[in-house]
């Protein structure tokens, strides 16, 4: 198990300072960079007694393993990994669960975008399989723009078993499939809900599909056969939001 991680990008570090400042071990800043957005972050980091180093772009690129760090990189204590047994605590806190299941999403940009969508829609937790899925990497946190610190991510060893457990707890699981007869806008998404999305191209795996209470499709009018998983996720989540508010 990793004890430390790297986080980079203004929004990612800002969210960490707001929600879990105790996790930040050290902060590296780009020498000579003048950006008003960095000033309050530096002030907060100093208030928490965080070690701050000013360094070159080459060093930041190496530490972030990316050039998209916006002049700020943090070495942090690894986030707590939530598992299947932690779901019961989450479910006990709400009468109307709203969850997202991502089956086989291995691209960090897609997971980051899904986290951002989930945060905006008010999703209470995202469930991913421990294998065949990307974890909370630095790129995921950067793309998520802070949502990696606000939306709990549950990594489970057996996704089908977890889905059945959710059903036993009264959660209705709606999966997506391009060939499904029921369209998204015809489905009832008002109650305790988990929306299950598959990887782009492959879709939900067979066992995951079999564990869904119903399958829905997103109506498509053009010539393309599928959408990016983060786009499809946003469409499904906000249709649920619309219904739950009406």
Curated annotation (Swiss-Prot):
Pfam families the record matches: SpoU_methylase, SpoU_sub_bind
One of the record's GO molecular function terms: rRNA (guanosine-2'-O-)-methyltransferase activity
Alphabetized InterPro entries for the sequence: 23S_rRNA_MeTrfase_RlmB, Alpha/beta_knot_MTases, Ribosomal_eL30-like_sf, rRNA_MeTrfase_TrmH, SpoU_MeTrfase, SpoU_subst-bd, tRNA_m1G_MTases_N
Catalytic activity: guanosine(2251) in 23S rRNA + S-adenosyl-L-methionine = 2'-O-methylguanosine(2251) in 23S rRNA + S-adenosyl-L-homocysteine + H(+)
CDD domains named in the record: SpoU-like_RlmB (cd18103)
Localization in the cell: Cytoplasm
Stated role: Specifically methylates the ribose of guanosine 2251 in 23S rRNA.
Protein name: 23S rRNA (guanosine-2'-O-)-methyltransferase RlmB
């Amino acid at each position: 198990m990793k004890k430390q991680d790297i986080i980079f990008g203004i929004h990612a570090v800002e969210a960490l300072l707001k929600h879990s400042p105790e996790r930040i071990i050290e902060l590296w800043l780009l020498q000579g960079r003048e950006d008003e957005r960095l000033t309050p972050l530096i002030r907060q980091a100093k208030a928490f007694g965080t070690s701050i180093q000013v360094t070159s772009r080459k060093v930041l690129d190496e530490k972030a393993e990316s050039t998209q760090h916006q002049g700020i990189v943090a070495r942090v204590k690894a986030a707590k990994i939530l598992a299947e047994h932690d779901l019961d605590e989450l479910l006990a806190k709400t009468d109307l669960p709203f969850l997202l299941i991502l089956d086989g999403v291995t691209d960090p940009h897609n997971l980051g975008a899904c986290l951002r969508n989930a945060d905006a829609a008010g999703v209470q937790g995202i469930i991913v399989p421990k294998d065949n899925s990307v974890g909370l990497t630095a790129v995921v946190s950067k793309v998520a723009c802070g949502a990696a610190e606000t939306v709990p991510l549950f990594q489970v060893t057996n996704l089908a078993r977890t889905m059945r457990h959710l059903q036993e707890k009264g959660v209705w699981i709606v999966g997506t499939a391009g060939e499904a007869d029921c369209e998204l806008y015809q489905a009832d998404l008002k109650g305790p809900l988990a929306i299950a999305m598959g990887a782009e191209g492959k879709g939900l795996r067979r066992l995951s599909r079999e564990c869904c209470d119903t399958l829905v499709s997103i109506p498509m009018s053009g010539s393309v056969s599928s959408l990016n998983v983060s786009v499809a996720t946003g469409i499904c989540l906000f249709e649920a939001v619309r219904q739950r508010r009406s």
